[in-house]
């Protein structure tokens, strides 16, 4: 099986961070090559040969091929390094973790992304912004955080009682929301606050 050579990365973007945290949890050292996506480095003809969607992360393998999309990369890394397991050990657990990861992606991560894209100065001039829509999405984010707080009642982690990719997805989403859209966890959301403190304190969160 082809082995990783390096990860095309952006230090701030949340999806490369998902892969970095996943790899760090497994003790995998991935050499990083920084790609300045804001300067358009991921949208050159040369980079499109690595990833036709023109984004990061991209994992380069030693057979000369490239793998894009953060969850796809994580699945590949899990196949190479099964432990510690982050995607599920059996069919039932895999389905449960996938369910929660998709919820974090579609209900939280996506809404935070739409908030950032339509309200953050970093995207002014890059996309047509719709500030009212962005603020409406901010409301959706806060509603989802309230529900996440209820879902964490009685659980240490998003998909149950151990750290998985679902926690990684939620962490990077909330953190980028705080960094670029001033999204904060309300102090009264005690379960969510404790979860965020718990996962942020893991060494991998600094990857």
Per-range role (PLM):
Residues 104-198:
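GST-like fold's C-terminal all-alpha helical module
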Residues 1-131, 135:
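GST-like domain detector, emphasizing the conserved glutathione-binding G-site
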């Amino acid at each position: 099986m082809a082995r990783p050579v390096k990860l095309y990365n952006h230090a701030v973007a949340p999806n490369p961070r998902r892969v970095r945290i996943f790899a760090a949890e497994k003790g995998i050292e991935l050499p990083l090559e920084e790609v300045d996506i804001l300067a358009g480095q991921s949208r050159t003809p040369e980079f499109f040969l690595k990833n036709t969607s023109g984004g990061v992360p991209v994992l380069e393998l030693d057979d000369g091929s490239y793998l894009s999309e953060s969850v796809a990369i994580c699945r590949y890394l899990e196949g190479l390094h099964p432990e510690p397991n982050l995607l599920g050990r059996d069919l039932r657990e895999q389905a449960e973790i996938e369910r929660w990861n998709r919820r974090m992606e579609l209900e939280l991560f996506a809404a935070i992304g739409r908030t950032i894209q339509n309200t953050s100065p970093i995207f002014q001039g890059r996309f047509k912004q719709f500030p009212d829509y962005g603020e409406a999405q901010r409301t959706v984010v806060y509603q989802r955080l309230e529900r996440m707080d209820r879902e964490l009642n009685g659980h240490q982690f998003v998909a149950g009682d151990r750290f998985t990719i679902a926690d990684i997805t939620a962490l990077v989403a909330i953190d980028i929301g705080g960094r670029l859209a001033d999204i904060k966890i309300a102090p009264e959301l005690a379960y969510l606050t404790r979860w965020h403190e718990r996962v942020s304190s893991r060494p991998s969160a600094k990857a």
